[in-house]
Amino acid sequence: MHQENLLALIALSALCLINVLIWLFNLRIYLVQRKQDRREQEILERLRRIKEIRDDSDYESNEEEQQEVMELIHSHGFANPMFEL
């Protein structure tokens, strides 16, 4: 009887460890995705501001902010054509 209890305890401990590892893996994936989404939102917000400024009649394009956005896009690995200005 003692050996069966020990085996059950070891099995339960192993299952708990596996459960914790799976949760940590899922948390890591979630945090990476959240960081990526935040970067995308920042880039889209900058593009929106550029378009609003461009629509103003007294906008003089010095291309500085556009260049900064393009560098930000490429530095974060976005190769999506929708981000092209």
From Swiss-Prot:
The chain crosses the membrane at residues 8-28. It holds the Pfam family Vpu. It comes from the Viruses. Residues 1-7 are extracellular. It is found in: Host membrane. Keywords: AIDS, Apoptosis, Host membrane, Host-virus interaction, Inhibition of host innate immune response by virus, Inhibition of host tetherin by virus, Ion channel, Ion transport, Membrane, Phosphoprotein, Transmembrane, Transmembrane helix, Transport, Viral immunoevasion. One of its GO terms (cellular component) is host cell membrane. Coiled coil: none annotated. GO terms for biological process: receptor catabolic process; symbiont-mediated suppression of host innate immune response; symbiont-mediated suppression of host type I interferon-mediated signaling pathway; symbiont-mediated-mediated suppression of host tetherin activity; viral release from host cell. Enhances virion budding by targeting host CD4 and Tetherin/BST2 to proteasome degradation. Degradation of CD4 prevents any unwanted premature interactions between viral Env and its host receptor CD4 in the endoplasmic reticulum. Degradation of antiretroviral protein Tetherin/BST2 is important for virion budding, as BST2 tethers new viral particles to the host cell membrane. Mechanistically, Vpu bridges either CD4 or BST2 to BTRC, a substrate recognition subunit of the Skp1/Cullin/F-box protein E3 ubiquitin ligase, induces their ubiquitination and subsequent proteasomal degradation. Belongs to the HIV-1 VPU protein family. Homopentamer. Interacts with host CD4 and BRTC; these interactions induce proteasomal degradation of CD4. Interacts with host BST2; this interaction leads to the degradation of host BST2. Interacts with host FBXW11. Interacts with host AP1M1; this interaction plays a role in the mistrafficking and subsequent degradation of host BST2. Interacts with host RANBP2; this interaction allows Vpu to down-regulate host BLM sumoylation. The N-terminus and transmembrane domains are required for self-oligomerization and proper virion budding, whereas the cytoplasmic domain is required for CD4 degradation. The cytoplasmic domain is composed of 2 amphipathic alpha helix that form a U-shape. This is Protein Vpu. The gene is vpu.
